Regions:
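Solvent-exposed soluble domains appended to multi-pass membrane proteins
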Residues: 1-182
Length: 182
């Protein structure tokens, strides 16, 4: 209902939706899940995929669809270790990310990226021009600018993220005028 209202408003809009049925170990089966596979988690993944597909098919039937960018992304690969027992440990597991109806054309070049790059890439995908193609720690993936992942690798980024910052340490040790921690 909210999406229909926003889509019919004639104004630019943003709507965020979250699915979490696949987020927990073994997943959370809903009343729409079918029992096709021997593992509950596989059934929950299949169920979630069917619901996302159904949602996208519904979107395609709406008047606003052709002028709407849809981003589907995860926040991390599965953490269900039991489900991964039969997956080759060398398999390169990644977070699923898809930009649908982007105003920009992807050139097909394989990129190394992280969630930092979502912000500028999403804005570019709706037609925004980004000076320098960088926002925050992210890079517009439709540009030729290098991402931090491409420049430093995942380990390099992780090393930088866990590094101590004297500035932040000082901020976290500040107390209020009454002597209590803020």
């Amino acid at each position: 209902e909210k999406l229909t209202e926003l889509g019919n408003s004639g104004k630019p809009f943003n709507l965020n939706m979250l699915t979490v049925d696949t987020h927990f170990e073994d997943g959370h089966p809903c009343d729409k899940c079918q029992n096709r596979y021997s593992e509950q988690y596989a059934n929950v993944i299949a169920c979630s995929a069917r619901q996302v597909e159904s949602f996208l098919e519904w979107c395609k039937q709406q008047a606003w669809y052709d002028n709407t960018t849809i981003l589907i992304t995860g926040d991390h690969p599965t953490m269900d270790s039991d489900f991964l027992l039969n997956i080759d440990e060398d398999y390169d597991r990644r977070v699923f990310t898809a930009y649908i109806n982007s105003a920009r054309t992807y050139n097909g070049e394989k990129r190394q990226y992280s969630s930092f790059d979502t912000f500028p890439t999403l804005l570019a995908s709706i037609g925004a021009d980004i000076e320098g193609n960088k926002l925050g720690l992210g890079v517009n993936l439709y540009s030729s600018s290098s991402t931090f992942t491409e420049e430093m690798g995942v380990e390099g980024i992780n090393d930088k993220l866990i590094a101590k910052s004297e500035f932040m340490e000082n901020l976290s040790s500040q107390t209020s005028e009454d002597g209590s921690d803020e």
